[in-house]
């Protein structure tokens, strides 16, 4: 595991226990020593189903069954199966509620076969489950990010409180019509000019810079690099609009400042 990521998490959540171990090696005992768990919340790795990655709607994903290389030098095979390792731990923990998250791509094309398998596994371990694709932009986040969310309630709990399978869908939060823009959330944040200028100089040395120069300055909407490249390249580079939420920010970046040739600091 990436040591810097673990240290960052500990810095932000100093009172939260951290188990930096392979989930395949974790058992319920590793969690129970911290007390009973009512809600088990997890986000198993999802790159195999990502639309922005190798997933192509309606066709077999090139990412399935492959080896994933991580920045810590480790390799993980069949990363899509880690969802079931998460459910294996949940089965032994027996929490009242399970919350799980994955990419929207899980609900389209051949990935639906995995979705159905996940739902069946929830039911096999004794949970009533419902899923829904939510967009973070509808919940006060200045970023368009769609994710498949699962809510599962242990069967004896649903019977005790009179919650039917159909009513689990009502547990998902209502969407807000109020949209938070980038300007709303960033206008009062002081920019570290040294860091920003370093990023600008670095970006100017890339092939993306010429495309960025062709894009409108301070656009009214998010602009995509491929629309300004003669061969349609740089599709993952997007110039943001301060009047809109950011597009989905991926692990490789791509979301650029609306007036300066740099990603966000």
Q: Which residues make up each language-model segment?
A:
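C-terminal target-recognition/interaction regions appended to catalytic cores
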Residues: 200-265
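Conserved Class I SAM-dependent methyltransferase catalytic core
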Residues: 71-153
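Core alpha/beta nucleotide-donor-binding catalytic domains of modification enzymes
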Residues: 1-94, 104-108, 113
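Short alpha-helical segments and helix-capping/turn motifs at coil-helix boundaries
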Residues: 23-28, 134-137, 232-234
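Short, solvent-exposed loop/turn segments at secondary-structure junctions
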Residues: 3, 45-47, 104-105, 137-139, ...
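Flexible, glycine-/basic-rich loop-and-beta segments that form/coincide
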Residues: 140-207
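Bulky hydrophobic/aromatic "packing anchor" residues in well-ordered structure
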Residues: 134, 186, 249-250
């Amino acid at each position: 595991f990436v040591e810097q990521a673990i240290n960052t998490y500990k810095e932000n959540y100093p009172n939260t226990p951290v188990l930096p171990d392979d989930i395949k090696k974790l058992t319920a005992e590793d969690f129970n020593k911290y007390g009973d768990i009512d809600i088990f919340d997890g986000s198993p790795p999802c790159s195999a189903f990502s639309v922005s990655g190798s997933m192509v709607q309606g066709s077999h994903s090139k990412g399935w069954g492959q080896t994933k290389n991580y920045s810590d030098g480790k390799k993980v095979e069949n990363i899509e199966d880690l969802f079931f390792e998460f459910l294996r731990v949940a089965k032994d923990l027996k929490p009242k509620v399970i919350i799980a998250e994955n990419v929207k791509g899980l609900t389209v094309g051949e990935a639906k076969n995995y979705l159905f398998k996940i739902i069946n596994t929830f039911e096999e371990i004794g949970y009533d489950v419902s899923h829904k694709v939510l967009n973070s932009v509808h919940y006060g986040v200045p970023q368009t990010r769609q994710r498949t969310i699962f809510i599962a309630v242990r069967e004896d709990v649903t019977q005790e409180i009179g919650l039917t399978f159909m009513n689990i869908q009502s547990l998902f939060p209502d969407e807000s019509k109020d949209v938070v823009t980038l300007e709303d959330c960033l206008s009062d944040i002081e920019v570290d000019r040294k860091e920003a200028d370093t990023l600008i100089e670095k970006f100017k040395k890339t092939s993306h810079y010429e495309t960025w120069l062709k894009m409108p300055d301070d656009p009214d909407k998010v602009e995509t690099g491929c629309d300004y490249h003669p061969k349609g390249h740089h599709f993952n580079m997007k110039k943001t609009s301060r009047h809109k939420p950011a597009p989905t920010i991926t692990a490789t970046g791509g979301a650029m400042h609306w007036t300066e040739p740099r990603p966000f600091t």
